[in-house]
């Protein structure tokens, strides 16, 4: 016998396999997609929150935007499809709870203002358990989160997406029928601005409306004298929005109490309702509501 490990061996005769009936496979795929369509039909507005890069506070914006919209009396849900870094449950103060299921499907966790929350974080056995999934598995999980969850009738579904324009963003654009649009999160830095331009061009590539840009960490207001400091530079978000022909929805200030609330797993919007940050989220929510509901 040759010692060459790459030598081609004569294959043993294999029993004949029946070819797969691709028509049945296609029917199964269509059935899953139809389930998503049926669930999404009961939701008036579906908004994806995206960012070109990580570390810009996208999930913080998603969570507080959801609370600000819900505070107006509208019925809101939020689905966290940032599988590798799910943080929405902690920011909404519902971390550690579990998803339940019945014969109708998966029941979401109920958060502040009655917000329906779904996240992979509810399914992980430990805090440090990684999610090691390829694109196809993530696509299937997104289908489940959209089609198997008992969302009921909602006014808004906020979709917290991972950074970048990869598999999850493409899956959402393909799976969510009549997606209302994207809110894009940035910070006032050149690196983030470049990444955001890619997100804007991605949205245009998949023919999805851009509702506007939120500039997070925009400035710092000194609590002693009220003076405003632009730590990362002034006017970068506004300039970029003008260059790309999109709306600047708002500029969220830096606030040390944001980190304190997030670390404690307490919803910032609830804990500090009178803060400049919470008031800015109310302004952003008001703009989003006017943009999407005036286009009915």
Curated annotation (Swiss-Prot):
Keywords: ATP-binding, Hydrolase, Iron, Iron-sulfur, Metal-binding, Nucleotide-binding
GO molecular function: ATP binding; ATP hydrolysis activity; ATP-dependent FeS chaperone activity; iron-sulfur cluster binding; metal ion binding
An individual GO BP term: iron-sulfur cluster assembly
Family annotation (CDD domains): Mrp_NBP35
Entry-linked Pfam families: ParA (PF10609)
InterPro entries: Mrp-like_CS, Mrp/NBP35_ATP-bd, P-loop_NTPase, YlxH/NBP35
Origin superkingdom: Archaea
Ranges of biased composition (kind: Low complexity): 1-17
Ligand binding (ATP): 52-59
Annotated segments matching region Disordered: 1-23
CC annotations in GO: cytosol
Cited HAMAP family: Mrp_NBP35 (MF_02040)
Similarity annotation: Belongs to the Mrp/NBP35 ATP-binding proteins family.
Subunit: Homodimer.
Anything else known: Although the second Cys residue of the CXXC motif is replaced with Asp, the protein has Fe-S carrier activity, suggesting that individual cysteine residues in the CXXC motif are dispensable for Fe-S cluster binding.
Stated role: Binds and transfers iron-sulfur (Fe-S) clusters to target apoproteins. Can hydrolyze ATP.
Official protein name in the record: Iron-sulfur cluster carrier protein
Organism: Saccharolobus solfataricus (strain ATCC 35092 / DSM 1617 / JCM 11322 / P2)
Lineage of the organism: Archaea, Thermoproteota, Thermoprotei, Sulfolobales, Sulfolobaceae
């Amino acid at each position: 016998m040759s010692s060459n490990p790459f030598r081609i061996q004569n294959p043993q005769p294999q029993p004949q396999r029946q070819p797969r009936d691709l028509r049945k496979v296609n029917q199964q795929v269509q059935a899953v997609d139809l389930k998503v369509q049926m669930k999404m039909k009961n939701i008036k507005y579906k908004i994806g929150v995206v960012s070109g890069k990580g570390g810009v506070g996208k999930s913080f914006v998603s969570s507080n935007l959801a609370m600000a919209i819900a505070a107006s009396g509208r019925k809101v849900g939020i689905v966290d499809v940032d599988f590798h870094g799910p943080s929405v449950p902690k920011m909404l103060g519902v971390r550690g709870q579990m998803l339940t299921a019945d014969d109708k499907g998966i029941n979401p966790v109920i958060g502040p203002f009655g917000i329906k929350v779904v996240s992979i974080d509810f399914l992980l056995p430990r805090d440090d358990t990684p999610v090691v999934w390829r694109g196809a598995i993530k696509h299937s999980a997104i289908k489940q989160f959209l089609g198997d969850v008992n969302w009921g009738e909602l006014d808004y579904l906020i979709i917290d997406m991972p950074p970048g324009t990869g598999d999850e963003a493409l899956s959402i654009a393909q799976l969510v029928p009549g997606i209302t649009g994207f809110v894009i999160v940035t910070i006032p830095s050149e690196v983030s601005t470049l990444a955001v331009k890619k997100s804007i061009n991605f949205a245009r590539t998949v023919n999805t409306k851009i509702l506007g840009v939120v500039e997070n960490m925009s400035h710092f207001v000194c609590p002693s004298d009220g003076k405003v400091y632009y730590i990362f530079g002034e006017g970068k978000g506004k300039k970029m929005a003008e260059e790309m022909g999109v709306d600047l929805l708002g500029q969220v200030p830096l606030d040390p109490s944001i980190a304190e609330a997030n670390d404690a797993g307490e919803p910032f919007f609830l804990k500090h309702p009178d803060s400049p940050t919470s008031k800015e989220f109310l302004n952003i929510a008001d703009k989003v509501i006017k943009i999407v509901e005036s286009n009915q």
